[in-house]
Amino acid sequence: MTNSSTFCPVYRDLEPFTYFFYLVFLIGIIGSCFATWAFIQKNTNHRCVSIYLINLLTADFLLTLALPVKITVDLGVAPWKLRIFHCQVTACLIYINMYLSIIFLAFVSIDRCLQLTYSCKIYRIQEPGFAKMISAVVWLMVLLIMVPNMIIPIKDIKEKPNVGCMEFKSEFGRNWHLLTNFISIAIFFNFSAIILISNCLVIRQLYRNKDNENYPNVKRALISILLVTTGYIICFVPYHIVRIPYTLSQTEVISDCSTRISLFKAKEATLLLAVSNLCFDPILYYHLSKAFRLKITETFASHKESKAQKEKPRSENNA
């Protein structure tokens, strides 16, 4: 290990980020719990988009498990064993969630594209059985890529402050980590292309139908497509712009201390944007899942009715 990597204080001053991660965790866990309740309460009819959204929700729960540990470690109050656990397990869960989210958003976009542009045909990819099978394949693929980072033996290093996860890794662990990063970047670029192409095709089709008498449904569909695209770009694009140079700084291809510190801070800031998909996903469920939308409507409608019934006797008594 070089002197620059030994003495460069890369992994410090993380406390300001932790407050934002904590806010994301609070909003995200409330939204995810409500989404779970809504999907359980309402029959989703096992439509493809519902299957993909349920898988997306499952991935979000992995993130809610990981964030409290990351927050504790970044605050500098975690015991040594918890810091090791974070590097081996919970940090990997964050990336498992990220790439599952990217892939399932791509399948949601494909499903919407086929529904709105080729509505007269039913393709194999739109069958619920195929959606379940491809979801299982996606989970298996992502876990096969990421889980070795959890189980490859780590080095036994002396306890010290501001230690980075790469310092725990053996040479084989570092090489696998590097391979994982570039596979992940390839996943991002390929599925980003799918999302953008699918959504552009849908927007073009909807624009052609803008004068149709069914305009309210067209407008709702357009909003949902723009929501997916905008949320995806905000959450995931900045992180992957930073990830390639940050990976090079981890392997000491980039060794300048100030550059490494800047890249690490940029990585943390863009990772914050990436995990904020936890807050964005419940909005996505509302626009894309009829079952979720109906449950929310029923819940607020019943709340208003009960409130009106409570206020009615008061008004009668005052009269």
Curated annotation (Swiss-Prot):
Transmembrane stretches, start-end: 22-42, 49-69, 90-110, 133-153, 182-202, 225-245, 269-289
Name the UniProt record assigns to this protein: G-protein coupled receptor 171
Keyword annotations of the record: Cell membrane, G-protein coupled receptor, Glycoprotein, Membrane, Receptor, Transducer, Transmembrane, Transmembrane helix
Function, in words: G-protein coupled receptor for Big LEN, a 16-amino acid neuropeptide produced from the precursor protein, proSAAS (encoded by PCSK1N). Acts through a G(i)-alpha-mediated pathway in response to bigLEN. Big LEN-GPR171 system plays an important role in regulating feeding and metabolism. Also plays a role in modulating fear and anxiety-like behaviors in the basolateral amygdala. Big LEN-GPR171 modulates the mu-type opioid receptor signaling and antinociception. Acts as a negative regulator T cell function.
GO biological process terms held by the UniProt record: adenylate cyclase-modulating G protein-coupled receptor signaling pathway; G protein-coupled receptor signaling pathway; regulation of feeding behavior; regulation of sensory perception of pain
Topology relative to the membrane: Multi-pass membrane protein
GO molecular function terms noted in the UniProt entry: G protein-coupled peptide receptor activity; G protein-coupled purinergic nucleotide receptor activity; neuropeptide binding; neuropeptide receptor activity
Family statement: Belongs to the G-protein coupled receptor 1 family.
One cellular component term from this protein's GO annotations in UniProt: plasma membrane
Extracellular side of membrane: 1-21, 70-89, 154-181, 246-268
Origin superkingdom: Eukaryota
